[in-house]
């Protein structure tokens, strides 16, 4: 967006590095065992995935953990790469719903309704009571990307209108 937003992003990244170093942690050991098993071997690989999920919109602001979003558009949120902590941070920032993609199936419910989206049909089949949407149907050739996208969009609207997610049905929120 502008130089100020760029500087906030740089400060956020360097702040994480400084935090890891100050606690004698190796910065580049960040990808979890699950990430590594899925093919993500470096912090750079993991970061590229985050950037891709953001799309091509310009970053409008960088906000601290627990700080609400005040700027329209794409915002970067300061927080660790931990599923539970990240979903809580999103909710604290003002998210009314969390769309959580997973290739391994983290079983949790966040403070806001959390749609868990399986990236593969094997996971969706194994964890039917955890997974709300199977995006693996695209890779399987059962649905086109546009068809699956339309299905997910309808599900998001349904949940926004009161339909419970799998976690909510089990009382986790």
Where do the language-model regions lie?
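Anaerobic metallocofactor- and corrinoid-dependent redox/one-carbon enzyme cores
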Residues: 1-173
